[in-house]
Amino acid sequence: MNTIKNRPKPNDKIYTPPKVVDIMLKFCDYKEGDLVLECCKGKGAIYDKLSEPKQYCEIDEGLDFFNHHKKVDIIISNPPYSILDNWFKHTYTLCNKFCYIIGMYSLTPKRVEVMNENGFYITKMLLTKIPSWFQRSYIIVCEKLEQEPETIIFKSINLGNKCLYCGQPCGGMRGKNIKHCKRKANETICRY
């Protein structure tokens, strides 16, 4: 099976569109003054919209998330899917609340079970389809709680079929339409 996990070099460096960052920050009830960790800074789409105090990790800058051990109030990020189990495991040691955007099929019953065993529960979920991304995604907000919440807030949002990086019509991950983003990979207007 050719999954991200099994590839010699995983291709899971996917930059978060600014519009999705805005949705994430609003959805997770991020408050100014919270000490926030962005653990996959990339080009700064999330990090640049956070107010102080804030910290980041970025493997390309030698700041490995797995070497970060300082407690924070909240983690907001788009983690790499190829190492998601270990990523969650380390997340549980750093905060009492996190907001991640992950592929819909990455939120498996086993992952939720392990999350709950570590005292974390999903309190909010937002389902969306991001044009040019492979699959639907969940924005999940998880909090460390004494017991499972009685209700979970669930929402969905339709982001249309225009690329969130450059505004052009998008055919998803297949076909000729995706090339408009790859050509602009180094431009600031398009973060793909």
How would you describe each model-predicted region?
Residues 1-192:
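Class I S-adenosyl-L-methionine-dependent methyltransferase catalytic core
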